[in-house]
């Protein structure tokens, strides 16, 4: 009921609106508008024919009439109603580079504004001769729409076709120049027509003099050369009485205060009467200001005596960068012209603006008179409004008098910043990966290092994330010095003292680096040591992170924010909510990924969430909830000279209320009008300028779905997850550019590395769209709800590229998990919908599976109106989703004989995979592939080039699509294919990206061409300059085969990307792919648990008793024969998925069902679980069955904790030499038996001198970066050379006979967990992996290394009290630990029985009550109260499966996590912690290179 009431309040709020700063009342939100569907008949075909003979087929959605004209392209991302009504397109057939057109339908084309001008259009109707698009949205949705685009075109008798490869057309025009063309329908032949021979200006100009703004004080004559309506609006708005005159009107004798010439189409030289009239003005004594726009610039230049020329491909779009020559300011402009002025300006005139990219003239000015003109459109619509100020300058000229020039009235630019002189820069990384802060910072940090090295600046990198690429110590792209240390003020201060950097970069290390930098600033450390923060200042960072300062800053510029209060207590939070009214949203200051945030429908929820939030921060913001509004993001770049560009705008498919990290996101935005797009863009730039951001930042908006009302949600003054997504979506290297800007380099001087020719001062155009979908692993966390909200829960994400929404969307869904077919009503991983499913609740309460609930609702014939009401998802997206399911229904009615080429092609165009189609047709995937290829249906390879094909690309950043007609690249490299890791998830994270990058770099160093396939936008491996060809694509059998055969690759490396590519080994091998390294057949034998165990028996290699089971009875019988506990393991899984230690018959039933669901095609193996054993990892490289490189590390924890969650020690600390020799011997036998050539990992149990094999993975493991960096030998470099048959120098490798064992240091790898984000999850370690990241540190001994590693995970050394809760069986071993902690001065608290035992053994302890018994004994304090008031700042909780206080222990653990208190749940880790605290009172700041230098010195 509470949820229903909350939903009702949200809807009521959305309908009636509430008070925002500077927001006017708006119309009520109508949940949907009816889309107009075309008649269900076959679309009429037509062709676009070019004068060079090119002929392309398409389908009509406009008027079915043939037409001829000049074919041009526009690279703008929005505003098609404004674009097609621009008079400058008269006589032209317009090609839209934006692939999806018609999303918002058409506005009321009869509506007029207060001036009598068309309200939403730029003229009195459509001016293009024809329209060419790739994909047309037959179903539209926008609150201003009254009809479809197709209907409008038909009304005005304008032909339009879709299904055209518009990128191919653009490239033809780019390479051959603008050319004539025609849209032809069957039976309607037309001849080519050259509109440039016609006086198009005369055709679009008014025939009569018209007056607008009558009675206004300033008289402006506007010469209509095809003037846009918005020019007139802007003039009248500034107080002009506008006299609009025909192009050939003699205005030379008219009285006016200023004259404006604007338009227009065609060849300006044909407008001779106008040129003569302007010449008279220029040569007369009249000095009233003259302002020319677009054609007005050309006419003014011709009248002055200059010449014009026809451009080869014209400048038409919304992202053209121009530079003001007089003050070096750069602007992004909208343009639409095919002619330009040459360099023949006479004396007295000079250029005013120049195009940054092609150096063409963009404006002229008279040196002594008030005459000026610009080639671009400052009045825009569609496009950016950055240069609208020129209208103000024009009016300033009028007011100032006649004897002045334009330069005297232009806005004064910000002072030009000088280059920042630094010689050494400290870059702070983000530390280990956690939810909300993942691999995107490895990518951004790596880019920053590269940028610094290009500018000859030395770099010191501080980051304990040993699995990251950026922490490599050797390589051309690496930092000069790397510190594996905690990112805390204490350690950073020590590094500053030692390294003496003069610059500091905070924006590349996420919230960790930002918060640390702010604290260093507050402590005065940066000032004391003379360290400059590069890029955005700390003051600006604080203004975005402190919620009150942020609110105050926005109010200074009257920007729109939700009503809010920054508070520092729960009491004040409750008061704020009462003032604002529920529901409210709370947000934490200095927090990441929405941590500490949530929607509070009532007082109780607010108390609960604010209590948890204040455990992490000292300030929260209580604001009005805007749940249900659209969430829009902009990535903004600003340099120190105040040049600004918005690199990407993104739209969350999920509405406000779901954290953007957990939302499906598309780029560019798909449901915004030009007015909405530009309003938010302009606001973004205003805010970024006001806050003083220098570099890159992300700004998030809530936009009302049926009005222009918006509010700013937050600004991230750093690189973020969205930044990485925007970089990969556009090809614009944001982190690299931001790092250059931090050095004071202005944007116009930075090259666009993709084109190699153009400037980085531009806004990318996309002729494709991308979809990002999060990857969750919530099933792994017992007790965690699948519901998602304002606090992020996803552990990774994928990004798919397509040319239709459906294609991009379905690809992205499949990328998330191999079990996902696409957009279907079926749940992933073979799960079933519950029999009591409440579908409406599933839709109204966002969850990790809601997208499938939407599919089910559509499949169940729920109306889209109802789905929209329940989800707040824009109906345009729902229309597209419905189209996918309609196609599935169509396919299910067909078979291989009845399937037509057209239907199969359409299915592929909207993202259906072969596997998906095969299930509909009742075929195998191989049969569907054969059917498709027989019909000659294959994908096309397209480039991402940042400029929608306007300029050639020098990089090979690629994707695959069925929406095309040609490839963008050739395929003569025959490179080596390397498969990446796919989305980050539990068990597969940045360590596998490190492996892939290491392999790629080795291949390139050996002179091999590389072809990389991956779909993860957070990775370094998807940085296009890491390889020769990057395919941002699915890691599926179908797509890998497509690419492999198209490229004719020399082979495929599958062993460096984790389990996803490893699982493809056998299917790829069976389809003729040459798998490099270990045979796929051997991989299959090792992955199948039963076969592998049988091989070990043959080899006489010891393992625990085992049995492959297929039924519950077999499992129960085995358990009975060996006694519980048993270990249950499925095959072909990563990170212990569905792996469990089973202690009882009930658990066996439960866990066996889960394991068989996860691994349906392979048996489940049961082994006897050996208690009290230590686990040992063997990471190795084999060559033809011989081990040539190895490292042995030891787990701190006893067996039972997944290796990914274990704390690793290298070298081993407690393992006997005899046991190590047995480990080596078993490894030797396994390598030989499986003929291993490449990387592999074997896990062992060691108890005393007994050694048992657990499992073997014939691929790289997650510990490869750790052992490689610790030993100074890149295991993947060695493995790659082995796999491709290169010679390997074994003399310096750690072979089994000659190991490399560090003598002067110990390395500790510690796991990173994200328990605070996983509400209600039990933070205890099991066989199934739960950690999200890892860190590693080094010390002279185990204790200093361990403390550094623990501190790097965010662990805080306790200062006050420690709560001890241990199960009775731990007591004998724990007494010494308790004594050590007491002797170190900690006050000990313990549950009653444990307290009695400690006191009886002379260890003072204060008894406390179990949570379930609180209040029963007044003399016992409440554990939860002691934790929350800070009396306890460490919790040690050591339960086992036999404890009767299961729930109480869970409550204690959860309370600690929710209160931000460190928690230890493993005895061995607790013991090591107590020893470390006792023995390492002061932790040094030495890192790996210090110990290496010491070892080298000793050796010398």
Swiss-Prot record:
<feature type="modified residue" description="N6-acetyllysine; alternate">
    <location>
        <position position="1356"/>
    </location>
</feature>
<keyword id="KW-0325">Glycoprotein</keyword>
<dbReference type="InterPro" id="IPR036897">
    <property type="entry name" value="CarbamoylP_synth_lsu_oligo_sf"/>
</dbReference>
<feature type="modified residue" description="N6-succinyllysine; alternate">
    <location>
        <position position="214"/>
    </location>
</feature>
<feature type="binding site">
    <location>
        <position position="1391"/>
    </location>
    <ligand>
        <name>N-acetyl-L-glutamate</name>
    </ligand>
</feature>
<feature type="modified residue" description="N6-glutaryllysine; alternate">
    <location>
        <position position="219"/>
    </location>
</feature>
<feature type="modified residue" description="N6-acetyllysine; alternate">
    <location>
        <position position="1486"/>
    </location>
</feature>
<feature type="modified residue" description="N6-acetyllysine">
    <location>
        <position position="630"/>
    </location>
</feature>
<dbReference type="GO" id="GO:0019433">
    <property type="term" value="P:triglyceride catabolic process"/>
</dbReference>
<keyword id="KW-0835">Urea cycle</keyword>
<dbReference type="InterPro" id="IPR002474">
    <property type="entry name" value="CarbamoylP_synth_ssu_N"/>
</dbReference>
<feature type="modified residue" description="Phosphoserine">
    <location>
        <position position="1093"/>
    </location>
</feature>
<feature type="domain" description="MGS-like">
    <location>
        <begin position="1355"/>
        <end position="1500"/>
    </location>
</feature>
<feature type="modified residue" description="N6-glutaryllysine; alternate">
    <location>
        <position position="875"/>
    </location>
</feature>
<keyword id="KW-1003">Cell membrane</keyword>
<dbReference type="GO" id="GO:0072341">
    <property type="term" value="F:modified amino acid binding"/>
</dbReference>
<keyword id="KW-0225">Disease variant</keyword>
<feature type="modified residue" description="N6-succinyllysine; alternate">
    <location>
        <position position="1360"/>
    </location>
</feature>
<feature type="modified residue" description="N6-succinyllysine; alternate">
    <location>
        <position position="751"/>
    </location>
</feature>
<feature type="modified residue" description="N6-succinyllysine; alternate">
    <location>
        <position position="57"/>
    </location>
</feature>
<dbReference type="InterPro" id="IPR006274">
    <property type="entry name" value="CarbamoylP_synth_ssu"/>
</dbReference>
<keyword id="KW-0067">ATP-binding</keyword>
<feature type="binding site">
    <location>
        <position position="1394"/>
    </location>
    <ligand>
        <name>N-acetyl-L-glutamate</name>
    </ligand>
</feature>
<feature type="binding site">
    <location>
        <position position="1440"/>
    </location>
    <ligand>
        <name>N-acetyl-L-glutamate</name>
    </ligand>
</feature>
<feature type="modified residue" description="N6-succinyllysine; alternate">
    <location>
        <position position="157"/>
    </location>
</feature>
<keyword id="KW-0539">Nucleus</keyword>
<feature type="modified residue" description="N6-glutaryllysine; alternate">
    <location>
        <position position="889"/>
    </location>
</feature>
<feature type="modified residue" description="N6-glutaryllysine; alternate">
    <location>
        <position position="532"/>
    </location>
</feature>
<feature type="modified residue" description="Phosphoserine">
    <location>
        <position position="1203"/>
    </location>
</feature>
<feature type="modified residue" description="N6-succinyllysine; alternate">
    <location>
        <position position="207"/>
    </location>
</feature>
<feature type="modified residue" description="N6-acetyllysine; alternate">
    <location>
        <position position="841"/>
    </location>
</feature>
<dbReference type="GO" id="GO:0006207">
    <property type="term" value="P:'de novo' pyrimidine nucleobase biosynthetic process"/>
</dbReference>
<feature type="modified residue" description="Phosphoserine">
    <location>
        <position position="1090"/>
    </location>
</feature>
<feature type="modified residue" description="Phosphoserine">
    <location>
        <position position="1419"/>
    </location>
</feature>
<dbReference type="InterPro" id="IPR005480">
    <property type="entry name" value="CarbamoylP_synth_lsu_oligo"/>
</dbReference>
<feature type="modified residue" description="N6-acetyllysine; alternate">
    <location>
        <position position="553"/>
    </location>
</feature>
<feature type="modified residue" description="N6-acetyllysine; alternate">
    <location>
        <position position="757"/>
    </location>
</feature>
<feature type="modified residue" description="N6-glutaryllysine; alternate">
    <location>
        <position position="1183"/>
    </location>
</feature>
<feature type="modified residue" description="N6-acetyllysine; alternate">
    <location>
        <position position="892"/>
    </location>
</feature>
<feature type="modified residue" description="N6-glutaryllysine; alternate">
    <location>
        <position position="453"/>
    </location>
</feature>
<dbReference type="GO" id="GO:0000050">
    <property type="term" value="P:urea cycle"/>
</dbReference>
<feature type="modified residue" description="N6-acetyllysine; alternate">
    <location>
        <position position="55"/>
    </location>
</feature>
């Amino acid at each position: 009921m509470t949820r229903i009431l909350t939903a009702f309040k949200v809807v009521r709020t959305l309908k009636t609106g509430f008070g925002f700063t500077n927001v006017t009342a708006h119309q009520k939100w109508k949940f949907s508008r009816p889309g107009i569907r075309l008649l269900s008949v076959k679309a009429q075909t037509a062709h676009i024919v070019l004068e060079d003979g090119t002929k392309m087929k398409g389908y009509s959605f406009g008027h079915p009439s043939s037409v001829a004209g000049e074919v041009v392209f526009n690279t703008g991302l929005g505003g098609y109603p404004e674009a097609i009504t621009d008079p400058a397109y008269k006589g032209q057939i317009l090609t839209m580079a934006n692939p999806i057109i018609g999303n918002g339908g058409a506005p009321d084309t009869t509506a007029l504004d207060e001036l009598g001008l068309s309200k939403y259009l730029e003229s009195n109707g459509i001016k293009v001769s024809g329209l060419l698009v790739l994909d047309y949205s037959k179903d539209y949705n926008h609150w201003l729409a009254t009809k479809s685009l197709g209907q409008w075109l038909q009304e005005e008798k304008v032909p339009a076709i879709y299904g055209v490869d518009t990128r191919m057309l653009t490239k033809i025009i780019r390479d051959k120049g603008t050319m004539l063309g025609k849209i032809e329908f069957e039976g309607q032949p037309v001849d080519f027509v050259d509109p440039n021979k016609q006086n198009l200006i005369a055709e679009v100009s008014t025939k009569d003099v018209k007056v607008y703004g009558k009675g206004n004080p300033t008289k402006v004559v506007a010469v209509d050369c095809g003037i846009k309506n918005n020019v007139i609006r802007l003039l009248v708005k500034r107080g002009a009485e506008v006299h609009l005159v025909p192009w050939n009107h003699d205005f030379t004798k008219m009285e006016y205060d200023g004259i404006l010439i604007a338009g227009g189409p065609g060849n300006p030289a044909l407008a001779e009467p106008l040129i003569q009239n302007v010449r008279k003005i220029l040569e007369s004594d009249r000095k009233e200001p003259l302002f020319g726009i677009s054609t007005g610039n050309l006419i003014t230049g011709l009248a002055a005596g200059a010449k014009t020329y026809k451009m080869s491909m014209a400048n038409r779009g919304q992202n053209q960068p121009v530079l003001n020559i007089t003050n070096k300011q750069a602007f992004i402009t909208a343009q639409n012209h095919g002619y330009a002025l040459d360099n023949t300006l006479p004396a007295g005139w000079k250029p005013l603006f120049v195009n940054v990219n092609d150096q063409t003239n963009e404006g002229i000015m008279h040196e002594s008179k008030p005459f000026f003109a610009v080639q671009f459109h400052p009045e825009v619509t569609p496009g950016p409004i950055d240069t609208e100020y020129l209208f103000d300058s024009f009016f300033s000229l009028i007011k100032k008098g006649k004897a002045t020039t334009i330069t005297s009235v232009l806005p004064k630019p910000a002072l030009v910043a000088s280059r920042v002189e630094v010689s050494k820069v400290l870059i702070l990384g983000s530390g280990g990966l956690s939810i909300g802060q993942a691999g995107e910072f490895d990518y951004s940090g790596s880019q920053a290092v590269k940028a610094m090295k290009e500018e000859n600046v030395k770099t010191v990198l501080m980051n304990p994330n040993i699995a990251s690429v950026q922490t490599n110590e050797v390589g051309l792209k690496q930092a000069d010095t790397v510190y594996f240390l905690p990112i805390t003020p204490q350690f950073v201060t020590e590094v500053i003292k030692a390294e003496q950097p003069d610059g500091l970069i905070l924006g590349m290390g996420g919230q960790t680096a930002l918060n640390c930098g702010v604290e260093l600033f507050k402590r005065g450390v940066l000032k004391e040591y003379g360290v400059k923060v590069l890029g955005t200042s700390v003051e600006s960072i604080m203004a975005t992170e402190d919620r009150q300062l942020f609110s105050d800053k926005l109010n200074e510029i009257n920007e729109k924010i939700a009503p809010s209060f920054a508070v520092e207590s729960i009491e004040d939070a409750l008061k704020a909510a009462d003032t604002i009214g529920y529901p409210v949203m709370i947000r934490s200051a200095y927090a990441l990924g929405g941590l500490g945030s949530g929607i509070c429908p009532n007082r109780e929820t607010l108390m609960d969430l604010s209590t948890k939030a204040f455990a992490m921060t000292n300030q929260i913001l209580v604001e009005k909830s805007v749940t249900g509004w659209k969430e829009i993001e902009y990535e903004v770049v600003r340099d120190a000279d105040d040049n600004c560009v918005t690199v990407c705008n993104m739209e969350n498919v999920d509405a406000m209320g779901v954290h953007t990290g957990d939302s499906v996101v598309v780029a560019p935005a798909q449901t915004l009008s030009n007015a909405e797009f530009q309003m938010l863009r302009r606001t973004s730039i205003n805010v970024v300028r006001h806050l003083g951001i220098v570099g890159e930042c992300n700004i998030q908006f809530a936009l009302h779905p049926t009005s222009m009302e918006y509010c700013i949600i937050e600004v991230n003054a750093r690189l973020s997850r969205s930044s990485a997504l925007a970089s990969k979506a556009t090809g614009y290297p944001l982190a690299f550019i931001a790092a250059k800007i931090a050095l004071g380099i202005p944007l116009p001087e930075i090259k666009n590395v993709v084109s190699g020719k153009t400037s980085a001062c531009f806004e990318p155009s996309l002729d494709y769209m991308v979809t990002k979908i999060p990857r969750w692993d919530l099933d792994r966390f017992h007790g965690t709800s699948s519901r998602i909200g304002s606090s992020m829960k996803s552990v990774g994400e994928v990004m798919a590229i397509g040319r239709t929404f459906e294609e991009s969307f379905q690809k992205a869904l499949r990328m998330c998990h191999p079990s996902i077919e696409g957009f279907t009503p079926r749940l992933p991983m073979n799960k079933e919908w519950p029999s009591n499913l409440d579908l409406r609740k599933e839709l109204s309460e966002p969850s990790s599976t809601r997208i499938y609930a939407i599919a089910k609702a559509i499949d169940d014939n729920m109306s889209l109106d109802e789905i929209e009401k329940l989800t707040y998802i824009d109906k345009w997206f729902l229309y597209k989703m419905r189209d996918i399911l309609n196609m599935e229904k169509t396919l299910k009615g067909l078979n291989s004989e009845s399937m037509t080429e057209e239907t199969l092609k359409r299915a592929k165009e909207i993202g259906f995979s072969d596997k998906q189609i095969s299930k509909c047709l009742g075929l195998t995937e191989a049969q569907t592939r054969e059917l498709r290829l027989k019909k000659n249906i294959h994908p096309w390879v397209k480039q991402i080039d940042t400029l929608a094909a306007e300029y050639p690309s020098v990089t090979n950043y690629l994707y695959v699509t069925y929406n095309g007609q040609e490839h963008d690249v050739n395929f003569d490299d025959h490179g080596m294919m390397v498969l990446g890791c796919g989305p980050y998830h539990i068990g597969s994270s940045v360590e596998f990206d490190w492996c892939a990058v290491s392999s790629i770099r080795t291949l390139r160093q050996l002179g091999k061409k590389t072809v990389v396939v991956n779909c993860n936008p957070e990775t370094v491996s998807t940085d296009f300059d890491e390889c020769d060809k990057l395919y941002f694509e699915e890691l599926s059998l179908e797509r890998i085969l497509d690419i492999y055969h198209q490229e004719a690759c020399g082979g495929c490396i599958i062993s460096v990307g984790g389990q996803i590519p490893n699982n493809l080994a056998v299917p790829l091998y069976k389809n003729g792919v040459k798998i490099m390294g270990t045979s796929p057949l051997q991989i299959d034998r090792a992955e199948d648990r039963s076969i592998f165990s049988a091989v070990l028996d043959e080899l006489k290699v010891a393992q625990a008793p085992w049995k492959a089971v297929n039924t519950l009875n077999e499992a129960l019988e085995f358990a009975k024969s060996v006694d519980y506990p048993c270990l249950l393991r499925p095959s072909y899984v990563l990170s212990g998925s569905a792996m469990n230690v089973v202690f009882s018959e009930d658990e066996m039933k439960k866990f066996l069902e889960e394991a068989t669901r996860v691994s349906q095609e392979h048996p489940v193996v049961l082994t006897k679980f050996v208690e009290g054993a230590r686990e040992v990892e063997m990471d190795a490289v084999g060559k033809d069955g011989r081990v040539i490189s190895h490292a042995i590390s030891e787990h701190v924890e006893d067996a039972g904790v997944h290796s990914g969650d274990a704390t690793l020690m290298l070298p081993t600390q407690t393992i006997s030499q005899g046991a190590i020799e047995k480990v080596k011997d078993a490894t030797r036998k396994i390598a030989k038996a499986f003929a291993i050539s490449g990387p592999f990992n074997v896990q062992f149990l060691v108890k005393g001198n007994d050694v048992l094999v657990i499992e073997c993975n014939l691929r790289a493991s997650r510990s490869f970066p750790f052992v490689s960096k610790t030993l100074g030998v890149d295991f993947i470099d060695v493995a790659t050379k082995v796999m491709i048959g290169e010679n390997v120098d074994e003399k310096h490798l750690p072979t089994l006979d000659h190991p490399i064992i560090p003598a002067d240091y110990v390395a500790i790898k510690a796991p990173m967990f994200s328990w605070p984000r996983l509400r209600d999850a039990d933070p205890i370690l099991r066989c199934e992996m739960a950690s999200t990241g890892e860190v590693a540190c080094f010390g002279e001994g185990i204790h200093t290394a361990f403390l550094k590693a623990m501190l790097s995970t965010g662990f805080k050394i306790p200062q006050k009290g420690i709560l001890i809760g241990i199960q009775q069986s731990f007591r004998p071993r724990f007494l010494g630990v308790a004594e050590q902690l007491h002797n170190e001065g900690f006050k000990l608290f313990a549950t009653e029985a444990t307290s009695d035992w400690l006191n009886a053994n002379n260890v003072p302890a204060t008894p406390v009550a179990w949570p379930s018994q609180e209040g029963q004994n007044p003399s016992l304090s409440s554990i939860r109260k002691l934790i929350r008031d800070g009396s306890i700042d460490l919790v040690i909780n050591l339960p086992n499966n036999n404890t009767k206080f299961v729930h109480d222990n869970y409550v204690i653990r959860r309370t600690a996590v929710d209160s931000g208190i460190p928690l230890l749940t493993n005895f061995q880790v607790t013991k090591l912690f107590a020893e470390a605290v006792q023995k390492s009172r002061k932790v040094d700041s030495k890192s790996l290179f210090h110990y290496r230098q010491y070892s080298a010195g000793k050796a010398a």
